């Protein structure tokens, strides 16, 4: 815990209740009350949800399955009348190098001509497989997708503030998600920003960058 009163580290497990949603690439939590200081009985749900990328060994890169889970969590929060705000963040640090990241965009190892490819299995324990091994698991009969753009539209259509909490690297499609959020709060120590979509022949940033106010 932080040395400051009532200020947690990146994630204080005792402040959050895990939502009953089956996930492999994301985590989804509801903030719970500490008691009188929060104005509600201890343990009662507060109107804030935390949605986090959970692929830290891959700098929280997303694949189609990740995007499906992210969309589902955001939609649950959007449709829940007792949720007033959403924190979009990421878990970490990486077990490889102890580095922190928000999201590094799409997992290029499974990108094809039609978009990012679904895999036959979705276990998070296989994140460290080599590119050749990942390509062998691509679901051949299923179209690739680039539906992170659907997530961006959902974020803009949600009538509740979405706060991007940036614990580290945010690049490419991850950078676009940060821009599309209503507010971004970044770690002074670990946060770094980079837009690399053009380097991989993508224009995911087109929607997000149009929202920048200069």
Describe each model-derived feature in a short phrase.
Residues 15, 58, 90-150, 201:
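Glycine- (often His-adjacent) and acidic-residue-rich active-site loop
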Residues 88, 107, 177-179:
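Hydrophobic/aromatic residues within transmembrane alpha-helices
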Residues 143, 147-204:
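Glycine-rich beta-to-alpha active-site loop
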């Amino acid at each position: 815990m932080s040395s400051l009163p009532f200020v947690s580290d990146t994630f204080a497990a005792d402040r959050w209740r895990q939502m009953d949603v089956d996930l492999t690439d994301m985590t989804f939590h509801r903030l719970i009350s500490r008691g009188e200081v929060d104005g509600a009985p201890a343990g009662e749900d507060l109107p804030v949800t935390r949605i986090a990328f959970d692929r830290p060994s891959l700098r929280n890169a997303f694949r189609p399955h990740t995007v499906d889970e992210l969309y589902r969590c955001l939609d649950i929060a959007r449709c829940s009348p007792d949720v007033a705000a959403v924190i979009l963040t990421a878990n970490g640090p990486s077990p490889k190098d102890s580095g922190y990241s928000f999201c590094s965009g799409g997992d290029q190892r499974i990108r094809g001509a039609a978009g990012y490819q679904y895999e036959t299995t979705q276990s998070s324990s296989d994140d460290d497989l080599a590119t050749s091994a990942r390509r062998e698991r691509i679901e051949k009969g299923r179209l690739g997708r680039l539906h992170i753009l659907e997530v961006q539209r959902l974020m803009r259509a949600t009538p509740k503030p979405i706060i991007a909490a940036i614990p580290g690297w945010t690049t490419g499609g991850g950078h676009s998600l940060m821009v599309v959020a209503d507010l971004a709060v970044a770690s002074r120590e670990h946060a770094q920003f980079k837009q690399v979509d053009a380097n991989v022949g993508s224009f995911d940033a087109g929607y997000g960058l149009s929202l920048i106010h200069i």
